[in-house]
């Protein structure tokens, strides 16, 4: 039968059709090879935007640095980083005038956070530049390595466990004449295998001590490693992102804490909230502009785009902002917060792995590391790369590039939002002193601007004034990429607004389906995604029911667990049929064991094990929820887990789902090939770290324990806890006298060993 597709839309309001315009199916593009080229692009662009600034040389590291601040005034149309300090300070002052006490309160809040934050805050986060090994590591390992090196160099403030004390060590480390570090290296030798009599390569891992002088240590402490941003849709070219080292991270965290606290109290800020809360906040601003405009007034909204936001921002401006925001605060607090922008003004960008060369015959491949780019003959490179390298050479020091202007991606999102909002704030009539006025929304580099005026000339004048005001603080609104609509229709951070925010359900499509963690988690994540979309994204009941059926089908095909009474033949069907036949209550079998689906849109919030528990055969219950089941090494029981879901656009979101641990919550074993590489020493360190933490959790079983504050170490805390527990158990008759004596003896031995060490 032929259906005219336009009929589908007869009854649908235009804004609901947005989900049909979705272009992103299939996998997003990933980057391969090195990010060196992209990083060079970033560095060269950043310097180009600030090229009329003043050049100076850093006395400590010898790095050439470009400072565009308070230099020439910015020009129309050309993006530039020529911010003016007094303009930024004035914008801050007006922001404070419109929000009395906002800075004062945020400072007090931040001071409290600083006093309480533990150093393990820095273990959150993914890859981190590890300065001791000069490459990326998981955050926890990088922190452990840094602390280990600090302690072996006599920096011990960090032992209190407070982040602020660790940062004292960081400051002190920068004054030391040299730092001694331990590096892992790998020896290869050819030996004859006794069994097969063949020659094999034997690898041994060694550790060696290395001394870094002050200059080299400073360069490493100020280094941001760079990687290529993966999975970006809708871009032809890849781009570079930065991962800072442990010296910078703690300072950035405190600055962002302050800025986050300010953003929470600014109605125009799209950060730090998200989801529905963000939509409500933004809808308020639009409503305000609509109701405050007189009937005769025109109101237009610009869906804004800024040119190269972070390459035109400048750490020196952030320093000025912080100096102003904290002006009446204690000296120590002002110092702690000003260190991050100062470090960023002196930052070095690591160029990554370098370039890969292949010979014409493709027989030979060789890697030119970034360190060699200073000396290598440029005839080997193509035209565009040659230009890049020539530009960057004067800035190179040991494979890192001096990059004073610019911020690198994703570093000061909150603080830069405060700067953006301070310009939106200047749109009030009392500041514009004329007939036009503006307001808007800002979230990191994304903005929407609402301008009201009596006529079109007024609107144009308002937009021009906004554009030029932004220029003065280093924000470059792109005239080519921003567009204007009558207020009521605009886009902001991938939310589309048309008389209210439109649910764009298709954005969530990539997160439907089977995640591939394990049978238990996948089932839970799958139904939670459907549930969340019913709550947040206008996924209707009929569509949700269909999504659920498709998910179950997908799940059964992924894990080859079709119903026990099906005709479909798979590798597992023989076993599952047998289980089906010997199960009395077939409804109690999990879907992953060939059972039926009991899910519908009303019970998506219940984990499958709980849903079917009463229906299960007793022996099946016993096998399913048995932590001692020898065939499965499974996860500890946690009530709530986090999954990372990828929407089509925007950052990966963390989503909570209920996790009931069963024998289906298995963990795949680690690939063994890592054990033969130089990573092995690091892996062993990591496992040791993990073991210590697990042991500690055993002594303090409730996860709500207050971590031992003060100077007691983990070992001391565990020993004293063991003594207390043993005494209680002995006095209540739970353990015998001999056992009690033995525990006390072990505790004394441990303390003795610590003293000798």
From Swiss-Prot:
<dbReference type="Pfam" id="PF00602">
    <property type="entry name" value="Flu_PB1"/>
</dbReference>
<dbReference type="GO" id="GO:0039694">
    <property type="term" value="P:viral RNA genome replication"/>
</dbReference>
<keyword id="KW-1191">Eukaryotic host transcription shutoff by virus</keyword>
<dbReference type="GO" id="GO:0000166">
    <property type="term" value="F:nucleotide binding"/>
</dbReference>
<feature type="short sequence motif" description="Nuclear localization signal">
    <location>
        <begin position="187"/>
        <end position="195"/>
    </location>
</feature>
<keyword id="KW-0808">Transferase</keyword>
<feature type="short sequence motif" description="Nuclear localization signal">
    <location>
        <begin position="203"/>
        <end position="216"/>
    </location>
</feature>
<keyword id="KW-0548">Nucleotidyltransferase</keyword>
<keyword id="KW-1190">Host gene expression shutoff by virus</keyword>
<dbReference type="GO" id="GO:0039657">
    <property type="term" value="P:symbiont-mediated suppression of host gene expression"/>
</dbReference>
<keyword id="KW-0693">Viral RNA replication</keyword>
<dbReference type="GO" id="GO:0003723">
    <property type="term" value="F:RNA binding"/>
</dbReference>
<dbReference type="GO" id="GO:0019083">
    <property type="term" value="P:viral transcription"/>
</dbReference>
<dbReference type="GO" id="GO:0006351">
    <property type="term" value="P:DNA-templated transcription"/>
</dbReference>
<comment type="subunit">
    <text>Influenza RNA polymerase is composed of three subunits: PB1, PB2 and PA. Interacts (via N-terminus) with PA (via C-terminus). Interacts (via C-terminus) with PB2 (via N-terminus); this interaction is essential for transcription initiation.</text>
</comment>
<dbReference type="GO" id="GO:0003968">
    <property type="term" value="F:RNA-directed RNA polymerase activity"/>
</dbReference>
<dbReference type="GO" id="GO:0039523">
    <property type="term" value="P:symbiont-mediated suppression of host mRNA transcription via inhibition of RNA polymerase II activity"/>
</dbReference>
<keyword id="KW-1035">Host cytoplasm</keyword>
<keyword id="KW-0547">Nucleotide-binding</keyword>
<dbReference type="InterPro" id="IPR007099">
    <property type="entry name" value="RNA-dir_pol_NSvirus"/>
</dbReference>
<keyword id="KW-0945">Host-virus interaction</keyword>
<dbReference type="GO" id="GO:0042025">
    <property type="term" value="C:host cell nucleus"/>
</dbReference>
<dbReference type="InterPro" id="IPR001407">
    <property type="entry name" value="RNA_pol_PB1_influenza"/>
</dbReference>
<keyword id="KW-0696">RNA-directed RNA polymerase</keyword>
<feature type="region of interest" description="Disordered">
    <location>
        <begin position="50"/>
        <end position="82"/>
    </location>
</feature>
<keyword id="KW-1195">Viral transcription</keyword>
<feature type="domain" description="RdRp catalytic">
    <location>
        <begin position="286"/>
        <end position="483"/>
    </location>
</feature>
<feature type="compositionally biased region" description="Polar residues">
    <location>
        <begin position="55"/>
        <end position="64"/>
    </location>
</feature>
<keyword id="KW-1262">Eukaryotic host gene expression shutoff by virus</keyword>
<comment type="function">
    <text>RNA-dependent RNA polymerase which is responsible for replication and transcription of virus RNA segments. The transcription of viral mRNAs occurs by a unique mechanism called cap-snatching. 5' methylated caps of cellular mRNAs are cleaved after 10-13 nucleotides by PA. In turn, these short capped RNAs are used as primers by PB1 for transcription of viral mRNAs. During virus replication, PB1 initiates RNA synthesis and copy vRNA into complementary RNA (cRNA) which in turn serves as a template for the production of more vRNAs.</text>
</comment>
<keyword id="KW-1048">Host nucleus</keyword>
<keyword id="KW-1104">Inhibition of host RNA polymerase II by virus</keyword>
<keyword id="KW-0597">Phosphoprotein</keyword>
<feature type="region of interest" description="Promoter-binding site">
    <location>
        <begin position="249"/>
        <end position="256"/>
    </location>
</feature>
<comment type="similarity">
    <text>Belongs to the influenza viruses polymerase PB1 family.</text>
</comment>
<dbReference type="GO" id="GO:0030430">
    <property type="term" value="C:host cell cytoplasm"/>
</dbReference>
<protein>
    <recommendedName>
        <fullName>RNA-directed RNA polymerase catalytic subunit</fullName>
        <ecNumber>2.7.7.48</ecNumber>
    </recommendedName>
</protein>
